Amino acid sequence: MAKQEQNIVYLYCDGACRGNPGPGGWGVLLRYNQHERQLHGGVANTTNNQMELTAAIEGLKSLKKPCQVVVTTDSQYLRRGITEWLPVWKRRGWRTSNKKPVKNQPLWETLEREVERHTIVWHWVKGHSGHAENEIADELANRGIDEVLKRGAQ
């Protein structure tokens, strides 16, 4: 485990999809001082990007009070969307540079509300590259998919 600063929440999030669209899951690993919490969930029909956004939203929603947070994701869509693209989309009336509607606007709006409560640093790591905490988040996201598929088979 990497050395972590005291009194900062470390949030590792990942989304996964089997088929795109298809059954999807999200996973979150939270670390704060000596405490650790794991969260996951799934949706029967979704996209990978929707699950990436949902993972970040659910992780931030789980924090009871405003915090300093370091969010680590393997999704450039999530990291660049929240740090670079969102203000531009809003200025353009939720349109892309091609004048098309921004995909997943309701999720982006929800994420923005959650982000506003905290002081956040966003980090990107390459997926499936041996980053231990990101691998745990990936396992949790896949657990979310497995649970959705299991419920569907019953």
From Swiss-Prot:
SUPFAM superfamilies linked to this entry: Ribonuclease H-like (SSF53098)
UniProt keyword Hydrolase, yes or no: yes
Cofactor note: Binds 1 Mg(2+) ion per subunit. May bind a second metal ion at a regulatory site, or after substrate binding.
Catalytic activity of the protein: Endonucleolytic cleavage to 5'-phosphomonoester
Magnesium keyword on record: yes
Cofactor: Mg(2+)
UniProt similarity note: Belongs to the RNase H family.
HAMAP family: RNase_H (MF_00042)
Family annotation (PANTHER family): RIBONUCLEASE H1
Designated name of the protein: Ribonuclease H
Organism of this sequence: Coxiella burnetii (strain Dugway 5J108-111)
Organism classification: Bacteria, Pseudomonadati, Pseudomonadota, Gammaproteobacteria, Legionellales
Gene behind this protein: rnhA
